Amino acid sequence: MSSVKLDGVLKAVKQVRGGVHVNHNKNTADCEVVRIPVPEKVLLPMQQHIGVPCTPTVKAGDKVSVGQIVGDSDKFLSAPIHASISGTVSAVKQATLANGVITQAVEIESDGEMRLFDGLEPPKVTGKESFLRAVRDSGLVGLGGAGFPTHVKLRIPPDKNVDTLIVNAAECEPYITVDYRECLENSWDILSSIYTLKEILGFKRVVIAAEDNKPEAFKVLKAIADRDVAED
């Protein structure tokens, strides 16, 4: 296993001129992540990221499985959308999102089985291009408001030299604590992903960016990273 020693943490500026300073309200910081029950029905909008909306690849009456692509686009700035439950497509229709955007959506009624798609298998990564393709096929997008497709972020232009990977664990919005819980509960998954990115994309330096109200999260990540370097 390739390893990397974390170089540091980017802390939020303690005093910012202007703006509105609201309470953090991180009341869920000590609550473990829980798995929600399987819903009876899901509505999957085809616009879940910045860029070109997906086109539905299924129709009403189709049987679908977990992980099956139900929407895709051949445009670069886009990412496929997968079924989150198994069941039957009950409708392909227009839907209005919380932000007022009107888009096509795939409605699936659950069969309660959460059956995995037969075509699901670990990606065969042999280099940079196959890795970026795997990221794209996974449908990964950012958790920010834009939902920026991850494969686009990771594709460095050939005329650019990027030597530092900054992993964003900052949560500037009040109430949100998902990044913090991920750092505590899935620290090795985060670090192993960092190792993979460093090795395949050739980063020389890695920094995890976090506010100074997350000392425990960074302490856990740094301890595991330092231990792995020592064992290597």
Positions of the model-derived regions?
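Iron-sulfur-associated redox domains of electron-transfer enzymes in respiratory
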Residues: 77-232
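Short histidine-centered loop motifs in beta-beta connectors
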Residues: 54-63, 67
